[in-house]
Amino acid sequence: MHQLGIEWNKLIAQIINFVIVLWVLNRFAFKPVLKILEERRKKIAESLQNAEKIKQELAEAEEARKEILRKANEQASFIVAEAQKVASYQGEKKIQEAVEEAKRVLKKAEESAKLEREKAKEEMRREILNLVIEITSKVVGKTLTLDDQERLKNEVLSKLPQKEGHEAYSRN
């Protein structure tokens, strides 16, 4: 092989150098680099798992948010409905109270008017009696005795209407 230009000493030295360089590179370069790459691959896989887990938790949180929102809307609708019922009830109650108050005021006014009407009737009776006695005294030309006045009063009162609702006096 010498004829081909191969020197065995140099070839073996080159092979030994190559093996040493390969061993040194493997020991100090390839293994640490492969170890770093493996760690990076694990971190990436772990990050992907965490991202998937976070994505799932986010979806669950979104579902929980939607459920809470739905429940809040239901509760708000219920509260609004209850408020409307209460407002309606309160409105009806206020209307009822106003109607009762109006009835009370109307009844009081009717009673007051009735009392005034009775007072006016009584006053008119007294005036009529006094006028009848005075006119009779003038027609007769003398002062009437107490008995005559009493008899005349009874006669006039018997001809005046006693019942409520009669507006005109009888002429009998």
Swiss-Prot record:
Keywords: ATP synthesis, Cell inner membrane, Cell membrane, CF(0), Hydrogen ion transport, Ion transport, Membrane, Transmembrane, Transmembrane helix, Transport
Gene Ontology MF terms: proton-transporting ATP synthase activity, rotational mechanism; proton-transporting ATPase activity, rotational mechanism
Gene3D superfamilies xref list: 6.10.250.1580
Localisation per UniProt entry: Cell inner membrane
Pfam families given in the database record: ATP-synt_B
Topological relation to the membrane, as annotated: Single-pass membrane protein
InterPro entries: ATP_synth_B-like_membr_sf, ATP_synth_b/b'su_bac/chlpt, ATP_synth_F0_bsu_bac, ATP_synthase_B_chain
The keyword Transmembrane is assigned to this record: yes
Transmembrane segments: 11-30
Main location class: membrane
Subunit note: F-type ATPases have 2 components, F(1) - the catalytic core - and F(0) - the membrane proton channel. F(1) has five subunits: alpha(3), beta(3), gamma(1), delta(1), epsilon(1). F(0) has three main subunits: a(1), b(2) and c(10-14). The alpha and beta chains form an alternating ring which encloses part of the gamma chain. F(1) is attached to F(0) by a central stalk formed by the gamma and epsilon chains, while a peripheral stalk is formed by the delta and b chains.
UniProt record similarity statement: Belongs to the ATPase B chain family.
Function of the protein: F(1)F(0) ATP synthase produces ATP from ADP in the presence of a proton or sodium gradient. F-type ATPases consist of two structural domains, F(1) containing the extramembraneous catalytic core and F(0) containing the membrane proton channel, linked together by a central stalk and a peripheral stalk. During catalysis, ATP synthesis in the catalytic domain of F(1) is coupled via a rotary mechanism of the central stalk subunits to proton translocation.
Protein name according to UniProt: ATP synthase subunit b
Organism: Methylacidiphilum infernorum (isolate V4)
Lineage: Bacteria, Pseudomonadati, Verrucomicrobiota, Methylacidiphilae, Methylacidiphilales
Annotated gene: atpF
